[in-house]
Amino acid sequence: MRVTDFHFDLPDELIARYPTAERSASRLLYLNGNTGEYQDQQFNDLLEHIHSGDLLIFNNTRVIPARLYGRKASGGKLEVLVERVLDEHRCLAHIRSSKAPKENAEIFLGEDKLGEGNGFKAIMVARYDALFELKFEASQPLFDLLQQAGHMPLPPYIDRPDEDADQERYQTVYSKVLGAVAAPTAGLHFDHQMLQKLQEKGVQTAFVTLHVGAGTFQPVRVETIEEHKMHAEYAEVSQDVVDKILATKAQGKRVICVGTTSVRSIESAAQAAEKEGKLIAPFYSDTTIFLYPGKTFRIVDALVTNFHLPESTLIMLVSAFAGFKNCMNAYQHAVESQYRFFSYGDAMFITKNENALGDVP
């Protein structure tokens, strides 16, 4: 399969640069994976599609203010995007500057927020391809430094500086475990009122953790998708989640994932468990799972997700789940109907196409 098979033309004005006034005020495109039929709805209509006994799985990762602005000892400006916190004083990060810092170089960060002379220093101790290992020379833990001086790491396509409102709106209301540098965006549509209505309806909920990395925005740089190497992200699927999934399946109910990160967490756990002859087992590890047309979904029956970038691994995942033709037809309709795209945009609710394995480009 060629990466260009997953291309579609997207007018710039359909990229959502700000969220809707209310979380659940987005539009919803319902796509029946088996029939390919779609329907224009509002996000609150999701309640019609999720039934008592169904299990809704969320990703409870919390976005860290991972973007820092600073300077090298020479005075040259740079930008740091923390990818992964290693311990209280070390992290792996992307660095943008005119010239990459050398090993043992000093970097001064946080002065734009904390004031001249009140920033903090980091040492570049090692480089691993595109990532730099930084050691922070401050008494406070790294998470505290980021809370004080970091900026919300809005995706590049939002194309504006972060604002105070993003501190709240670029987090899900149920976010709990610090570690992501991008939000699991399908969850941004859920407010407390909607979660309450789902509970009253008898819908079960469970939470996985996958710390979304900056690699989620990296373009696929190969021509054929089978050559693509996925970036690693850390995921946790607990015994409690496994028990709920097994109970849901035993009752003939559906497992519904909120977001592609929840899908990748659950399907990673299922893939690992298959080697032990199990349907699913607890999972605490990095995952590089890549789901594209021709790949199997062992657990997930339905999916809530946003509209993704052309030629991205995420539209490939949706194509694998809904069927390639169904997915691309629905996306074409979304463009023509002026749905809002990407992180702050509208959502889809998709039921699994049981014949998707035969629908590849």
From Swiss-Prot:
Keyword set includes S-adenosyl-L-methionine: yes
GO cellular component: cytoplasm
Highest taxon listed in the record's lineage: Bacteria
Molecular function GO labels: S-adenosylmethionine:tRNA ribosyltransferase-isomerase activity
First-level EC class: transferase
Location of the protein in the cell: Cytoplasm
The protein's annotated pathway: tRNA modification; tRNA-queuosine biosynthesis
Reactions catalysed: 7-aminomethyl-7-carbaguanosine(34) in tRNA + S-adenosyl-L-methionine = epoxyqueuosine(34) in tRNA + adenine + L-methionine + 2 H(+)
Keyword presence, Transferase: yes
Its EC number(s): 2.4.99.17
Annotated keywords: Cytoplasm, Queuosine biosynthesis, S-adenosyl-L-methionine, Transferase
A biological process from GO: queuosine biosynthetic process
Physiological role: Transfers and isomerizes the ribose moiety from AdoMet to the 7-aminomethyl group of 7-deazaguanine (preQ1-tRNA) to give epoxyqueuosine (oQ-tRNA).
UniProt similarity note: Belongs to the QueA family.
Subunit structure: Monomer.
Protein name per UniProt: S-adenosylmethionine:tRNA ribosyltransferase-isomerase
Taxonomic source organism: Glaesserella parasuis serovar 5 (strain SH0165) (Haemophilus parasuis)
Gene: queA
